[in-house]
Regions:
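N-proximal low-complexity "stem/linker" segments adjacent to membrane-targeting elements
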Residues: 1-42, 477-479
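Conserved donor nucleotide-binding strand/loop of the catalytic core
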Residues: 72-89, 97, 105
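Short beta-strand-to-loop acidic/aromatic patch adjacent to the donor-nucleotide binding site
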Residues: 109-123
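Donor nucleotide-sugar recognition loop
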Residues: 198-200, 209-228, 234-240, 257
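Terminal low-complexity segments of carbohydrate-biosynthetic enzymes
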Residues: 1, 264-479
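Acidic donor-binding segment of Leloir-type glycosyltransferases
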Residues: 43-80
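A recurrent flexible, glycine/aromatic-enriched loop bordering the glycosyltransferase active site
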Residues: 176-200
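Conserved donor NDP-sugar-binding/catalytic core segment of glycosyltransferases
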Residues: 123, 127-170
Length: 479
């Protein structure tokens, strides 16, 4: 969608002058991306945005001292090193520290305190922070702001302006692409946005006691759940023109082990904050089985393996969230064990398919493909084996020729190449595991769903997160 840039087209007069004073804590969660953090904070400092009522908390999940040393001389900036708790743990640490600071100083009496969550690797104009402050000062107390997301690469098209989840089908992350001006956003009555991405998400600190802290689910889905809980508490999420950032879009990388978190956390959301969507056990399983079947069809056995682990951990309940760093290492190792590390240098000899301009099949060709698949495995004996090179943003098996035996996927946004080869043994093993999981799902879904619903108040409580941070800090000091 081609629209104006994240700041273009709105003058200061489009945003009303502040009525009440706002105290803003910017929380940046980072992991080995010092250059991005230094660039963005320098921009805020040079623009004169930071001050007594606008401060920054940088949560460094790499637990090192380098970033702290580099930012030691910057006023109104505090760095908190900690172990890797993912984006969920990093951003929650920032909210937790902001709550402690507000309670300790009593500054909430003079200003309305807000928290602004920001990714470490975004690009933005400091003016968007000023506009956010003006909007908060005039928009009422029951308001959250989701910054619009623009592609960091030219021509910087709009990618998302808030989003919904589970609306059309269970696993459905739908970007909202109806940007509105500031005044229209404030006047709108019905909330059409479920959540805002944590590249830029702002909310009132005082209401965290009512809404709770985010779920400790490491990455992927933490913002999906948290945004919906704000909506359920009576808050509106708006994403007006003029408040946006530039960031890599989700198709800029080929996703591997992260599908463990996407699967597990989506199931947690469907069982708790998005239970109202009404997706039942059978429908959810149908989509899970279909998606894993697609992974097997493109020979990505690593992705199938981590998705099955995600389902298994959902059925285990909240105890699966314990020892998240150790579990993260296990999941990345699991994907690596099923991936092919050596990419062959034979692209020129392969059947080339451009996924941006996929081949069109005639009716006769489609009928032939259906017949060949129906006659398996007999048809595989006489049909020649195919070795394919796919070029595109998203790896799909939809356009693979019959009897494809290996795929070299060239991910055009990143320039990286991934190799996948058919394995009859792996396919048989995962189909058997999928069949076993189907029975476990039928037996355990109801119990797991209820257990997650009962666990959410504890998992999102101040006390629970305080225990997590205390344990993590103690282990760091011990090392």
């Amino acid at each position: 969608m081609k629209v104006q840039s994240e700041t273009q087209g709105l003058s200061g007069s489009d945003y009303p002058s502040a009525v009440q004073r706002i105290a803003l804590t910017l929380v940046i969660c980072t992991f080995h991306r010092e250059e991005f953090v230094l660039r963005n904070l320098s921009g805020l400092e040079e623009a004169g945005v930071l001050g007594d009522h606008i401060e920054v908390l940088v949560i460094d999940n790499s637990s090192g001292e380098s970033l702290s040393a580099k930012l030691a001389g910057m006023a109104h900036v505090r760095v908190i090193p900690q172990g890797n708790l993912g984006g969920a743990g990093g951003f929650t640490r920032g909210i937790y520290e902001a709550m402690k600071a507000a309670c300790g100083t009593g500054s909430t009496e003079a200003c309305e305190p807000y928290v602004l969550l920001m990714d470490d690797d975004i690009e933005f104009d400091p003016e968007v922070v000023r506009r956010t402050l003006d909007l908060l000062a005039n928009g009422g107390e029951k308001l959250c702001i989701a910054g619009q997301l623009y592609n960091i690469h030219p021509p910087h098209d709009l990618f998302e302006a808030g989003a919904t989840f589970g609306e059309r089908k269970p696993f459905d992350w739908k970007p909202y692409l109806k940007p509105t001006c500031c005044s229209a956003s404030l006047k709108a009555g019905q909330n059409e946005i479920d959540y805002g991405g944590w590249w830029y998400f702002c909310f009132p600190l005082k209401a965290v006691g009512q809404v709770g802290l985010p779920l400790p689910i490491f990455i992927r889905g933490d913002d999906v759940d948290y945004g919906r809980r704000w909506v359920d508490a009576g808050y509106r999420i708006i994403s007006p023109d003029g408040i946006g950032v530039r960031h890599e879009t989700f198709d800029a990388r080929y996703t591997t082990w992260i599908y463990y978190y996407e699967t597990r956390n989506a199931l947690i959301c469907l069982a708790t904050s998005y239970k109202f969507r009404g997706w039942g056990m059978a429908v959810i399983w149908k989509h899970l089985e279909y998606n894993i079947g697609k992974d097997l069809g493109r020979f990505d056995y690593g992705r199938a393996a981590v998705k099955l682990e995600g389902i298994r951990d959902f059925l285990r309940g909240a105890e699966s969230l314990d020892e998240c760093e150790a579990r993260h290492r296990e999941i990345t190792a699991l994907y690596a064990a099923h991936s092919l590390q050596n990419v062959p240098d034979d692209e020129a000899t392969r059947v080339m398919i451009d996924l941006e301009r996929p081949p069109r099949f005639s009716l006769a060709g489609r009928l032939k493909s259906i017949a060949l698949k129906a006659l398996r495995p007999l048809s595989c004996i006489w049909a020649s084996e195919k070795h394919v090179a796919l070029h595109g943003k998203v790896f799909t098996s939809k356009h693979l020729p019959f009897n494809t035996r290996s795929v070299l996927f060239c991910h055009t946004p990143s320039g990286k190449k991934y190799f996948f080869r058919h394995s009859a043994d792996q396919e048989k093993r995962f189909l058997k595991e999928l069949s076993q999981m189907r029975r476990q799902w039928a037996d355990g879904f109801g119990t797991a769903e209820k257990a997650w619903q009962e666990a959410v108040p504890r998992l999102t409580s101040f006390d629970h997160w305080e225990q997590i941070f205390a344990s993590l800090d103690a282990s760091q000091k011990g090392n």
